Amino acid sequence: MQWEVVIGLETHTQLTTQTKIFSGSPTQFGAEPNTQTSPVDLALPGALPVMNRGAVERAIQFGLAIGATIAPHSVFARKNYFYPDLPKGYQISQMDLPIVQGGRVSFALEVDGKTEIRSVQLTRAHLEEDAGKSLHEDYQGMTGIDLNRAGTPLLEIVTEPDMRSAAEAVAYAKALHTLVTWLGICDGNMQEGSFRCDANVSVRPVGQKEYGTRCEIKNLNSFRFLEDAINYEVRRQIELIEDGGRVVQATRLYDPDKKETREMRSKEDAHDYRYFPDPDLPPLVVSAEWIARVQAAMPELPGAMRERFVRDYALSEYDAAVLTQSKGMANYFEAVVAAAGKEQAKPAANWLMGDVASTLNREDIEIAAAPVAAAQLALLLQRIADGTISNKIAKEVFGAMWEAKSDSAKLADELIESKGLKQISDSGALEKIVDDVLAANAKSVEEFRAGKEQAINALMGQAMKASKGKANPAQLTELLKKKLTA
């Protein structure tokens, strides 16, 4: 039997407000336990919540970015459940009337070597408060409770069950991560829990309309864990059904060491939480004027920039999608092109996706911390274009520029000069190199003249070696062919 996978994601994004959603306590990560709390966060009697305007505006920004409906009237509700790090005994969330309704997120997905642009329909995005944390280490066999995180503003983003593979779910999650960090509404730090996903996974026979029984995998805080957890859960469910069993609705956790999911508890439905409107908070009213003010301050969005890169710089869909995965990288690219000229757009894209990206990954830093400024890279590209250096030598110069950590605008020129790396384009000098190589490699010359055309590659390699990589490759190839066919 063939199976279809059905996936929906719920993503918890911590909003970048300086204070909590219903109190004035700070939201700084990493403070000593229970030093960032207030009577509201601790649920002390008589303490009343007050809505954080900044959290609302970040939700509005997100809704506008995905083409959603911003509800003019939304309501906060109490989600009732017991957990040690939930001091009130309920979480303030939104149920029937969320602030963001509908919308779509588009993303690029590699399918059979081709890039497809797909989109996922969102059900909603709602505001809520985060819970505290249970600490299980260093407490002499007991569990400690840290309420610093309690009350941190969250925007929970819920999709329709539109995704059909783990790869598609990861591509969507990455696009969502790009969007919320691009907007500046979330810092996207997955290690600190600022962006974490719950995956709802089910399987059904191909062609069946009814959904299978779903299981929810909680708190996946890396894209690799998300993909591995979904793939394992899909295999588990299919094997269970094919062996005559049935999938039981449950909440599961992913164990990255064993690379498997395990049951945490039976899966709750909405009625288990006994939602009801919070009597301490009035309905949230968002006026058209408020929405217009937020929209006026919105940056260019990744999708619009991706389309502009394809249109204005003649980049491929793939190149444009990669460059717009990060606002910092996209802005750096445009700064390079502005300095080097529009004709350098494709070389700039290649360098950013190649040498620059690999160096950033190796040093585990963002483009904002790169020691090579956009204008410095632009000059390097110009020196390749005008024949001063070859692409191979440019890589050496780039490495030296990175290590130099200099703010000199002429850094590329200075290094080329000081290291003697200028490309040899003088015809007399090149001719001498070619003559010496031909004289020393009579066998390769004979093979070429006998019809083995690839023999020229060996001669080319010897000539480049003799010039220490500085010979102009195009001129060298032309000169070699001329002398070999003379």
Curated annotation (Swiss-Prot):
Molecular function GO labels: asparaginyl-tRNA synthase (glutamine-hydrolyzing) activity; ATP binding; glutaminyl-tRNA synthase (glutamine-hydrolyzing) activity
Disulfide bonds: none
Broad class of enzyme this protein falls into: ligase
GO biological process terms, semicolon-separated: glutaminyl-tRNAGln biosynthesis via transamidation; translation
Leader sequence residues: none
Reaction(s) catalysed (UniProt annotation): L-glutamyl-tRNA(Gln) + L-glutamine + ATP + H2O = L-glutaminyl-tRNA(Gln) + L-glutamate + ADP + phosphate + H(+); L-aspartyl-tRNA(Asn) + L-glutamine + ATP + H2O = L-asparaginyl-tRNA(Asn) + L-glutamate + ADP + phosphate + 2 H(+)
Ligase as UniProt keyword: yes
Catalytic activity, EC: 6.3.5.-
Keyword annotations from UniProtKB, A to Z: ATP-binding, Ligase, Nucleotide-binding, Protein biosynthesis
One Pfam family from the record: GatB_Yqey
Subunit note: Heterotrimer of A, B and C subunits.
Family to which the UniProt record says this protein belongs: Belongs to the GatB/GatE family. GatB subfamily.
Known function: Allows the formation of correctly charged Asn-tRNA(Asn) or Gln-tRNA(Gln) through the transamidation of misacylated Asp-tRNA(Asn) or Glu-tRNA(Gln) in organisms which lack either or both of asparaginyl-tRNA or glutaminyl-tRNA synthetases. The reaction takes place in the presence of glutamine and ATP through an activated phospho-Asp-tRNA(Asn) or phospho-Glu-tRNA(Gln).
Protein name from the UniProt record: Aspartyl/glutamyl-tRNA(Asn/Gln) amidotransferase subunit B
Organism from which the protein derives: Janthinobacterium sp. (strain Marseille)
